[in-house]
Amino acid sequence: MTVTKQLKQKYSTLWNSAVDHKFITELGDGTLSRERFSRYFEQDYIFINDLAKMAGIAVAKAPSNKMARPVEEFLNAILGAEDALFIDAFRTLGINETQYLNVQALPTTSAFGDFLVRLAYEGSFREICTAMLVTEGVYLAWGERLRSEKANPAADGSELGKFYQGWIDLHNEGALGPIVRHQTAVVDQAMDIEMPRLESIFEQALRYEVAFWDMAYNGET
């Protein structure tokens, strides 16, 4: 069994909690409230900054240009097309520039971002890739899950439903598959001596993913 499969098997309960969260389920069936999605989107926009920092440091720590290239391409997507997508989405959600530029990070957003940035500075390239395997792998998994269930939140014809459908469609194999496969290949080369640390990172990142969904769904002060 590969290292990645071992990690997913050992922490399957957490993995499934992240992929099958009620936030995702309601996103797929179109019943997720605008308030909950807006809170998620505002916090995710803040979180992306720390994810980009981690990816940038990963590029610098990569052992070769070949290993760095997929992460660099992922980083370019975050800083380019994805950032533009967020700006357009805020307009759709009725959130103006003053509002989204002045949103404060909620505690879970801050904690998750701090965890990733600290790991980026202190950890190895493989350790960073382990965290990214969670952050990107979970998103690919829930996107594939909703597609397999033929989720169609746009069926009611509402603007919000169409937006939800677009968000689901964005998280697909074409967009996330390359970086997830790259991180999987890096993690699968881990030696036994590295495993305790990788397991800890994988578990912590998953706990933060679940907490992020909880925060988006329930709110936080």
What are these regions (language model features)?
Residues 2-3, 7, 115-116, 214:
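Hydrophobic alpha-helical segments
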Residues 3-14, 65-67, 96, 164-167, ...:
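A structure-centric feature marking long, well-folded core domains of fungal metabolic enzymes
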Residues 8-32, 51, 181-189:
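Short alpha-helical hairpin
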Residues 12-17, 31-61, 81, 130-140, ...:
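Alpha-helical bundle segments that constitute or directly flank the non-heme di-iron/ferroxidase center
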Residues 19, 47-54, 81-85, 108-112, ...:
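Amphipathic, well-ordered alpha-helical segments in soluble domains
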Residues 68-175, 207:
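Active-site-proximal alpha-helical scaffolds that flank and shape metal-associated catalytic sites
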Residues 173-202:
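Long amphipathic all-alpha helical oligomerization modules
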Residues 199-221:
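Acidic, carboxylate-rich catalytic segments that either coordinate divalent cations
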